[in-house]
Design a protein with these regions (language model features):
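Short, catalytically relevant binding-site loops at active-site mouths
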Residues: 192-194, 225-227, 249-252, 258-259
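Catalytic beta/alpha-barrel core
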Residues: 217-224
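Alpha/beta catalytic barrel-like cores
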Residues: 29-141, 148-164, 168-179, 209, ...
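Polybasic, lysine-rich low-complexity intrinsically disordered segments
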Residues: 3, 11-20
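Aromatic (phenylalanine/tyrosine) cluster motif
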Residues: 5, 21-24, 30
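Glycine-rich phosphate-binding "P-loop"
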Residues: 184-199, 292-300
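Conserved mid-sequence domains
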Residues: 232, 240-251
Length: 362
């Protein structure tokens, strides 16, 4: 007898086999986006959506001359377009298996610029709530990475005050979206100002001066030139701030500072995970690879995921998110899904399926 088993993506139906009069059942396959133990995150821009006509992207900009010519109303219109496109991107991410997304700091352009008329979030509150509602519905994590001009450890009070204003803006956006504590804001340690030990001490002192809404979301990332992973862990233990481990910055720092001794990357994982556990926040890592140009430049794609990151859920019993910092954005993530299918959040089944994550993501 012939093997008459058949699977199709079409809707369920009955098909008659003309020769032997056997009945087939055509099975409908469901695709569901579920949270995974290791999730890959998209940074700010989507190449696929940016190529649409009209383009979909949440980081429109506006130069000062245009603001002066057209006024604050035009600025708000472009911000509204940013937010409308952000809503579309959250839905797109869910359909394409992406559960973590870094928001662009350009979402509200010139929000902290003292040279233009100040404006409130009132005109955008409904859209902010819509973004947050969609992210919470899908159990997606939204984060920020404020620019490197945010310098908590600066010895200059005026620059520190500007940093406060900038970080408050990012915190306010996440708060208006209704996002929980896993929606963090990542900053680097900043410059060393000629004395690393004095700067680390000042960083801790200034951190305690930050508004509570900023401290609730701020996390510290190692960089390739100033703050090593050891420095970040030291600061973390003093002020109880979570540490984001950037794998590429770790390797670059070792190249640029051959006089310093480091253990293998996996050695630091327990301290890093503990920094998040103390605050009850899901751990977050950054992965990138060297591209063309100076040390630290990002490549188009990621060829290899570090083994010590992939084994965290099984070894430590903790689920983690990993931002993919590659120039090809979502295309780099899809390439990794092909190489590491266990990372793909899209699950195909003949039954509707929903997995409950082990930890709360918001």
């Amino acid at each position: 007898m012939r093997n008459l088993f058949s699977i199709s993506l079409q809707k369920k139906k009955i098909k008659l086999k003309s020769e032997n009069y056997f009945l087939f059942r055509i099975i409908k396959m469901y695709t569901t986006c579920v949270n995974q133990p290791v999730q890959l995150g998209l940074c700010c821009l989507n190449i696929t959506l940016k190529a649409e006509k009209p383009p979909i992207y949440p980081s429109r900009k506006m130069i000062m001359r245009i603001i002066r010519e057209r006024g604050i109303g035009e600025l708000k219109r472009r911000i509204t377009d940013n937010l409308k496109d952000l809503v579309k991107m959250v839905h797109w991410n869910e359909k394409n298996g992406i559960k973590v997304f870094r928001l662009s700091s350009e979402l509200f352009m010139h929000k902290t610029n003292p040279e233009i008329e100040d404006y409130t979030f009132d005109f955008a509150l409904d859209l902010l709530k819509e973004v947050g509602a969609a992210a919470r519905k899908y159990n997606q994590r939204l984060t920020f990475h404020p620019g490197q001009y945010n310098v908590v450890g600066t010895p200059h009070e005026d620059k520190f005050q500007k940093t406060i204003v900038e970080l408050e803006y990012h915190a306010d956006v996440l708060n208006h979206m209704g996002m929980g504590k896993n929606s963090v804001m990542v900053v680097h340690g900043g410059g060393l100002y000629g004395d690393k030990e004095a700067t680390k001490k000042r960083w801790c002192e200034n951190y305690k001066r930050l508004p509570q809404k900023v401290r609730d979301r701020l996390v510290l990332e190692n960089c390739e030139r100033a703050f090593s992973i050891k420095d970040c862990i030291e600061v973390s233990k003093q002020v109880n701030i979570p540490v984001v481990f950037d794998t590429h910055h770790f390797e670059c720092y070792k190249l640029l500072h051959p006089e310093e001794h480091f253990e293998e990357a996996g050695y630091y994982i327990p301290d890093i995970l503990d920094s998040w556990k103390r605050r009850g926040i899901k751990p977050k890592f950054h992965v990138s690879e060297q591209g063309s140009g100076r040390t630290g430049h990002h490549s188009d794609y990621i060829e290899v995921m570090p083994k010590y990151l992939l084994e965290i859920p099984e070894k430590y019993g903790v689920w983690v998110d990993v931002m993919i910092e590659a120039k090809k954005k979502e295309l780099a993530i899809f390439k990794l899904y092909e190489k590491y299918p266990e990372l793909n959040c899209l699950i195909k089944s003949d039954k509707k399926f929903k997995r409950k994550p082990k930890i709360h993501l918001h």
